[in-house]
């Protein structure tokens, strides 16, 4: 696959030879392969999108008792522990450059996770997800040599403008919270950085190993910001076990289940098909935000979301045509 098209899909793993945030589409545990082997690959890809958004929506229930940073820290710590047990990565023989690359991927992952969580506390989840999606879309468009992609970039920009045209924000606020929008934009930048290092890490770590290491770095990076909040929230609560159970459940949904589903789907789908499917993720975010959190978008905002999704699909199809 040409270098110019590897980042087009906008998913957490953007190449046919990659999976999760770490690149390799290596086989996961045998039990996971057996459990998903008979499920159509497109269903797995769509299921992965739902696990992301359901996990994010569920995590909002932890914001009040643990704080946004605390809830994020707990989720990443649990996910890192689970993935380390599954992958059992070894750092022996890695060069300083390889370790720095996976560390940067982990920092981008931690930043993206924390910023996204902070954003959805202030603006609807569908808006945050759509703005964040500009990160991978921007990488795809920037790496393309096709003149038509300038038009898709303009369409995506129009979509963001339409998304911001809201009369009401969360909790009765007048319009969308500007800090929330800025946080979503910062999350998009983190996702773009995260994508750049995806393939590099996948070239030196097999299977789930790179994922386990990068998520562990993310957990350590967020710990100084959210560790104390999570600890005090758990210790001071009379529902400590329930909060811990929720944290485990959220982490198992995203990132653990998400990446396993995506890795399996990518082993059986072309990157072109996978890219088109994952371009629908902002729409899934709007649906989950409505069903789980009771959030709705104005018609003009839905039109903006449609512009971003259309730009992503068009960029994906255009790039695959260059292969």
Regions flagged by a language model, labelled:
Residues 1-70, 104-107, 111-115, 158, ...:
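Glycine-/small-residue-enriched transmembrane alpha-helix faces in small-molecule transporters
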Residues 2-6, 12, 16, 20, ...:
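C-terminal-most transmembrane helix of multi-pass membrane proteins
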Residues 40-44, 70-85, 149-158, 179-186, ...:
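Hydrophobic alpha-helical transmembrane segments of multi-pass integral membrane proteins
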Residues 46-58, 86, 103-118, 161-162, ...:
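Hydrophobic alpha-helical transmembrane segments of multi-pass membrane transport proteins
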Residues 62, 71, 75, 119, ...:
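Hydrophobic/aromatic residues within transmembrane alpha-helices
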Residues 70-78, 117-147, 187, 271-290:
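Specific alpha-helical transmembrane segments that line the substrate/conduction pathway
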Residues 74, 105, 131, 151, ...:
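Hydrophobic core positions of alpha-helical segments in small-molecule transporters
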Residues 83, 134, 148-169, 288-290, ...:
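Hydrophobic transmembrane alpha-helices of multi-pass small-molecule transport proteins
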